[in-house]
C-alpha cells in the first residue's frame, strides 16, 4: 500500500478504500442466548461457523481489491505486547468498566486474565467470562441480590460492527460515547490503540472522546468531502454530540466547514443514519423511504470572527439540499425502488447499509436482490456477500467496517 502522511485519511465515503478495520466473528456470538440476545441488541442468534464463513467472503473481496485489513484484536495485541505494566493497566481498567464490584472477584479476574496469552485474553474479554471459568469463584451477596449468575463479565457481540465505537474523520477520529450500556466497553480498545499503538499514538487528533456526556456512534457519521460532513441525529446519536463535534472540528481549524445534521425517527429499524442513507458514487446515494421515514435537516456552519456556530433548519428536500452543498445534481436510489414490501424487507436486512470500496463500486448483502439489481441498472458495480447469519445483528457491510485510509478524490 502506498504511504500516506497520516495513519488516518478519510475525506470521503467513496474514495478508493486502502485500509480498513474489521473484527472476526468470535465466541462472543456463541454466548448469546434467547434470554439475553435482545439486551445485546441482536434479534436472533447467529450460527458462528457460517457467520465466520460469510465474514471471510467479505474480507476476501476487500483483499482482492487491494484493501489492507487491520483486525481490532490484532491492534490491541500489538499495544499490550510492548509492556507488562500496560497489560496490567488495561486489565484493571477493563474489569472496572465491566462494573465488577467485589475485591475477591476483581482479584480472581486479574489472575485469570494475566494467566492467558495476550491474544487469548483479548478474545476472552470480547467473548465474556462465565462463572465456571473462574476457579474458587463464589457469588457474593451483591451478585445474588442483583441477579448476576451466568456471566461474570458479559460478552460483547457488537464488536463485529467496528463502524460505531470510533469514526475516522479527516486525519482524526471520534472515540464515541456509545448510547447503550452494553456497547460502552467496546471503546476501551480504541482508547488504547490511539493512545499507545506506535502507528497511531500522537499522530491522530481526537475530535471527541469516549467520556463525553452525550452519545455519538459511527453509523451516524458520514464524510462527504473535505469540507462537508453529514451526521445523523438518531436513536443512538444525540443532538448535543453533533454540536459538540462541530465545535471541535471548527475550532481545530480542520478543512470541514459545514455539517448537515439529518434527524431521523428514533426507531430500532433505523438505529443509525447509515441504515437508511449512504453514498455510493460521486453523485449517487441510496436511501430508504416509508410512511414514517422523514429527514429534518439542520445546517451547522462556523463564523471565525465571532467564534460562534450558526445553525439553521433547511426546508428543501434532501435531494435539493445535497445538490446545493455538493455543488452538483445528485440522484437517490431508493431501497427496492421504493416498493412498500421489498423496500421495508431489504432496509431491515441492510439494503442501504453498503460499503463503497471505490466510486460506483460497493459491497452489499446478496439477500437484498431487488435493491442490488437497481444499483447495477444504474451503473453501480456490486460485490455480493452471503448474509444469512451476519444480518441477524442488524448491521451490513458498512456497519462491519471502519475505513482508516481512503484515496482522496
Swiss-Prot record:
Main location group: cytoplasm
Active site: 399 (amidino-cysteine intermediate)
Pathway: Amino-acid degradation; L-arginine degradation via ADI pathway; carbamoyl phosphate from L-arginine: step 1/2
Disulphide-bridged cysteine pairs: none
Pfam families from the UniProt entry: ADI (PF02274)
A molecular function GO annotation: arginine deiminase activity
EC number(s) given by UniProt: 3.5.3.6
Reaction catalyzed: L-arginine + H2O = L-citrulline + NH4(+)
Localization in the cell: Cytoplasm
InterPro entries: Arg_deiminase
Sequence similarity: Belongs to the arginine deiminase family.
Protein name stated in the entry: Arginine deiminase
Species assigned in the record: Borreliella afzelii (strain PKo)
Amino acid at each position: 500500500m502506498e504511504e500516506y502522511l497520516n495513519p488516518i485519511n478519510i475525506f470521503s465515503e467513496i474514495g478508493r478504500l486502502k485500509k480498513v478495520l474489521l473484527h472476526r466473528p468470535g465466541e462472543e456470538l456463541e454466548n448469546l442466548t434467547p434470554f439475553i440476545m435482545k439486551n445485546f441488541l441482536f434479534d436472533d442468534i447467529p450460527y458462528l461457523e457460517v457467520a465466520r464463513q460469510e465474514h471471510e467472503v467479505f474480507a476476501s473481496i476487500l483483499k482482492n481489491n487491494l484493501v489492507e485489513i487491520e483486525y481490532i484484536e490484532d491492534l490491541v495485541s500489538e499495544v499490550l505486547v510492548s509492556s507488562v505494566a500496560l497489560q496490567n493497566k488495561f486489565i484493571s481498567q477493563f474489569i472496572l468498566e465491566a462494573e465488577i464490584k467485589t475485591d475477591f472477584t476483581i482479584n480472581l479476574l486479574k489472575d485469570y486474565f494475566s494467566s492467558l496469552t495476550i491474544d487469548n485474553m483479548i478474545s476472552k474479554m470480547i467473548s465474556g467470562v462465565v462463572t465456571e471459568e473462574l476457579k474458587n469463584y463464589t457469588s457474593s451477596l451483591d451478585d445474588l441480590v442483583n441477579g448476576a449468575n451466568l456471566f461474570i463479565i458479559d460478552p460483547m457481540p457488537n464488536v463485529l460492527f467496528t463502524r460505531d465505537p470510533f469514526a475516522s474523520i479527516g486525519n482524526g477520529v471520534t472515540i464515541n460515547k456509545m448510547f447503550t450500556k452494553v456497547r460502552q466497553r467496546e471503546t476501551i480498545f480504541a482508547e488504547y490503540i490511539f493512545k499507545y499503538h506506535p502507528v497511531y499514538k500522537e499522530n491522530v487528533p481526537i475530535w471527541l472522546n469516549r467520556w463525553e456526556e452525550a452519545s455519538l456512534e459511527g453509523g451516524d457519521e458520514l464524510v462527504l468531502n473535505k469540507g462537508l460532513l453529514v451526521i445523523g441525529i438518531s436513536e443512538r446519536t444525540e443532538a448535543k454530540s453533533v454540536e459538540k463535534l462541530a465545535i471541535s472540528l471548527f475550532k481545530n481549524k480542520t478543512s470541514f466547514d459545514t455539517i448537515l445534521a439529518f434527524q431521523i425517527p428514533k426507531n430500532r429499524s433505523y438505529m443509525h443514519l447509515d441504515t437508511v442513507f449512504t453514498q455510493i458514487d460521486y453523485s449517487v446515494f441510496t436511501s430508504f423511504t416509508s410512511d414514517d421515514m422523514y429527514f429534518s435537516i439542520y445546517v451547522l456552519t462556523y463564523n471565525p470572527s465571532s467564534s460562534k456556530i450558526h445553525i439553521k433548519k433547511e426546508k428543501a428536500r434532501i435531494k435539493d439540499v445535497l445538490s446545493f452543498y455538493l455543488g452538483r445534481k445528485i440522484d437517490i436510489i431508493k431501497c427496492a425502488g421504493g416498493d412498500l414490501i421489498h423496500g421495508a424487507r431489504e432496509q431491515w436486512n441492510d439494503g442501504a447499509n453498503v460499503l463503497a470500496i471505490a466510486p460506483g463500486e460497493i459491497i452489499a448483502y446478496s439477500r437484498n436482490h431487488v435493491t442490488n439489481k437497481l444499483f447495477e441498472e444504474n451503473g453501480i458495480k456490486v460485490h455480493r456477500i452471503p448474509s444469512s447469519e451476519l444480518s441477524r445483528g442488524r448491521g451490513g457491510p458498512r456497519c462491519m467496517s471502519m475505513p482508516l485510509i481512503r484515496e482522496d478524490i
